[in-house]
Amino acid sequence: MNFAMALDYQSCINCKACEVACKEENGVQLGADKQRIWVGQTEETIFGKPFVNFYPSQCNHCLDAPCVDVCPTNASHFTVGGLVMVDKEKCILCKGCMEACPYDARFVDDKKVAVDKCTFCYDTRILNGETTTACQATCPTKVRLFGDLDDENGELVQLLKSRKFFVLKEDEGTVPKLFYLVPEQDENFAIRSIGHNTKIYTWDEFKPIIEKAKAKRSPQWKSM
């Protein structure tokens, strides 16, 4: 198993339903700065009128995760399916992982007295055999699709085979597993929507990157 998520981000309406569902599902601490998932935005002008692009984000569960490398206590670690997790009992709040994460996907949970982040609903859903996350299940415009990259016949891989996509900050070399689907009619939309140049991938181009990183890191993955 190698869990990941595709996002048809052009369909995001910034309704915040995913953020609310995540907090309720996972008991995330209240507060605007306490988010496992969030919706970012960029602005542009189209035909002389202002236009806002929304792009949902969260922990990318990188296959070459720098947060895991810098953690002195192994609190940040890989678990089943290549998920990056935080063991709150081992976390000493050094915040090294927060500084190492290029996606700003971590925050301090004052109740747990530990760093917190998205887990793809590992404790509440994956361990119970469920195949969707809370954010996917609640999204009214079907932005997210969670799945297993090792399942060639699964819905996620089939979608990635049919659509081009990009990942955030690919130059960091983290091999992230959030895939942002490019609008079929306009590849330049991706560049405009995030405000900088980015490489557009096909699944055949990105799959070898995934496989190389998995071969390197999978010995660290814990079993369910």
Regions flagged by a language model, labelled:
Residues 1-224:
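Non-ligating segments of multi-cofactor redox enzymes
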